[in-house]
Amino acid sequence: MAYLGKKNKPAILPMQIAYFTGLRLGEVCGLAWQDINLDEQYLTVRRSVRYNGARHKTEIGPTKRKKVRTVDFGDTLTKILRKAKKEQHRQRLQCGQLYHLNYYREVTEKNRVYYELYHLDGTAEIPEDYTEISLVCLRPDGAYESPSTIGIVCRTIKNRLPGFENFHFHALRHTYTSNLLANGAQPKDVQELLGHSDISITMNVYAHADREAKRNSAKLLDKVVGSD
């Protein structure tokens, strides 16, 4: 995480959340503070953020399976989230009126409803059809962190950091799956945590992650005890 530096620092929290909960990228970006119970240590996955290329808009809406699910987490993520919340409060005070708040608005086009995501600073006049949403993953100025921006950071890690040539955001979800199953979690429970439609998807992810781990171990052994 230290490699990301100041410029890409906003991408750290989304990655940490994904690592400890297995959420998809869009689900992480759509997570709001009211979805998180820090005392009871669980979060509720209600929505997802995505960029609609056809409309050239960032939208917020239902998750992939259009189902709400609950995911428990432990002390480590609790500390991370408490620290992030405190830091966001500090940044809001520091920025004053220049701090951005996030909003969505309902738009109907061709008999289809969309929820567009926007951010405005404190000097802007807020349209009547805007509804504020307190998202968790933010930039220092309070604007929401988008999946596309995080994707760029992931590609930077992949291209520039040795040993991470196969890294992508979804790998964090795979790691979460693999860690749970390898430590005795029931496949059905893991399926529900991940929001998979079929348990075979869960097991295929685990099998793939297990193969990757063995492949990487073999390469490491080649380097350590190679014949050269």
Model-derived segments and their meaning:
Residues 1-31, 38-39, 67-68, 91, ...:
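Basic, Lys/Arg- and aromatic-enriched nucleic-acid-binding interface segment
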Residues 3-8, 59-68, 138-147, 160-171, ...:
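Short, contiguous acidic/charged loop-to-helix segments that flank catalytic cores in large enzymes
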Residues 16, 20-27, 149-156, 160, ...:
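C-terminal catalytic core of tyrosine-transesterase DNA break-rejoin enzymes
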Residues 35-42, 185-205:
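Short, polar N-cap/turn motifs at the start of nucleic acid-interacting alpha helices
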Residues 40, 51-53, 58-77, 82-83, ...:
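C-terminal secondary-structure termini that scaffold catalytic or DNA-interacting sites
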Residues 45, 73, 137, 154, ...:
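Hydrophobic, well-ordered secondary-structure elements that form the walls
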Residues 49, 175, 194-220:
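Catalytic-site neighborhood detector that most strongly recognizes the C-terminal catalytic loop/helix
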Residues 74-164:
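Active-site/catalytic core of tyrosine-dependent DNA strand-transfer enzymes
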